[in-house]
Amino acid sequence: MADAATIAKLEEGFKKLEAATDCKSLLKKYLTKSVFDQLKDKKTSLGATLLDVIQSGVENLDSGVGVYAPDAEAYTLFAPLFDPIIEDYHKGFKQTDKHPNKDFGDVNQFVNVDPDGKFVISTRVRCGRSMEGYPFNPCLTEAQYKEMESKVSSTLSNLEGELKGTYFPLTGMTKEVQQKLIDDHFLFKEGDRFLQAANACRYWPTGRGIYHNDNKTFLVWCNEEDHLRIISMQMGGDLGQVYRRLVSAVNEIEKRVPFSHHDRLGFLTFCPTNLGTTVRASVHIKLPKLAANREKLEEVAGKYSLQVRGTRGEHTEAEGGVYDISNKRRMGLTEYQAVKEMQDGILELIKIEKEMQ
């Protein structure tokens, strides 16, 4: 059971949320008094409480979601809060629904979406994974961070062929290596205020690191927001090549590192927005005509469940008509379906852009 000091902090946080009339987070929407009373004294076997779940959203009232899972068990123990938030965010993934089993499908169904190279600047597919037997960031000890990093780096050092590469720990990294990784846009920084408030950045930079292959088309982040972020990317529009590389990497890593998986929610991640397939397939794409007709762009994006962001990701502008466009849906469909929906949408956008020229 949670101790008295934690419960007192929770009561205070709940009052703050209640008083914040302009707060629009899913946390505020679904943390009703009855849900709060039901969960405030619960504690996972690793010692995580409701405070670990909600503290980022309490501190940052401008959060969109406002909750994180401190460990895998939290998704079950605090389900009365997580389930409605998951249903709301992953439109229509109801509390009775079950995420399908992993299915990368026929990898040869994916193509180069822009063979002429006129529209797509680069293509990227990533997924997140958590290592079984370890909690998520807020509950990890310094020793666990080190242990996880050594497991990950030794697993990655066994990769062969085009996945073969080098692991760079953030601890003790030289300025030269750091600058090189920044120039390649590979280096991740210490978490933003949302992650800081969720206690996701403790013992930084212990246990954190970056692996990339020699061609710089395959990347693994160790202990950034999730235990593992596995990323495949390259210039141009060859989604097929990018997807096949990711699938072979995930399968290779999975042979050596067991991943946390939930019967109902799929692959588990620190943030509930990434659950399920955890897959985000995206392109940087130039659409000058559609950029001038934002309504049409949003209409097509809506039809194919695409998320349109500015050039540098969330909350940024499109520079020179370049957008970051990705699949929006991660839950209740297979990996294959998520990426296929994105491919169909991008092909349609390019077709319309050509017609408008």
From Swiss-Prot:
Instruction: Read off the Pfam families from this record.
Output: ATP-gua_Ptrans, ATP-gua_PtransN
Query: Where would you find the membrane-spanning parts of this chain?
Result: none
Limits of the Phosphagen kinase N-terminal domain: 9-91
Q: Which of UniProt's keywords are assigned here? A: Acetylation, ATP-binding, Kinase, Nucleotide-binding, Transferase
Q: Which InterPro entries match?
A: ATP-guanido_PTrfase (IPR000749), ATP-guanido_PTrfase_AS (IPR022415), ATP-guanido_PTrfase_cat (IPR022414), ATP-guanido_PTrfase_N (IPR022413), ATP-guanido_PTrfase_N_sf (IPR036802), Gln_synth/guanido_kin_cat_dom (IPR014746)
All copies of domain Phosphagen kinase C-terminal, residue ranges: 119-356
Could you give one GO CC term from the UniProt record?
extracellular space
What Enzyme Commission number(s) apply to this enzyme? 2.7.3.3
Q: Which residues carry this modification: N-acetylalanine?
A: A2
Q: Which GO terms describe its biological process?
A: phosphocreatine biosynthetic process
Name the enzyme's class: transferase
- Positions of ATP binding: 122-126, 185, 229, 280-284, 309-314
In Gene Ontology terms, what is one molecular function of this protein? ATP binding
Reactions the enzyme catalyzes:
L-arginine + ATP = N(omega)-phospho-L-arginine + ADP + H(+)
Q: Does the keyword ATP-binding apply?
A: yes
Q: Which residues bind L-arginine?
A: G64, V65, G66, V67, Y68, E225, C271, E314
Annotated family: Belongs to the ATP:guanido phosphotransferase family.
Q: What is the recorded name of this protein?
A: Arginine kinase
Name the species this protein comes from. Callinectes sapidus (Blue crab)
Lineage summary: Eukaryota, Metazoa, Ecdysozoa, Arthropoda, Crustacea
